Amino acid sequence: MKIAQYGTTIAIIHAIANGLHGLAHLEIPIPLSHLQSLFVGIVIFLIPIIAAVLLWTQFYRIGSWLLLCSMAGSILFGLYNHFIAISPDHVSQVAFEGWGLLFQVTAILILIVDGLGAGIGFWALRNIQQQEQGAL
């Protein structure tokens, strides 16, 4: 039950932070490539929602894996695009005012939230494994 609660909570916070970041992308504007948009739509938005739903069902193990993998994917995507590759999507290329302020704050917030989300996914998988070993 706690796994589902924590996983759902982090998925909601993740969606809000990424939604605000996406809004900043639109308003500045900082367009994404088609491949980036596909990744964001599937890995960053859709899969965490599916994971949160599955955590409440008999498929909670799959939900835990999806949560861990989507959060890890989101971390890698954000690290590369916002802090490594110099492009219009890099935090150093966006003014720290107006929508740029929201962009930069949410870029950092997303890393923190996704780190927590990956940690929750890992913790969930470890708990599931321990429960199954205890049942043997």
Regions found by a protein language model. Give the residues of each.
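Juxtamembrane cytosolic interface motif at the C-terminal end of transmembrane helices
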Residues: 54-56, 80-81, 122-126
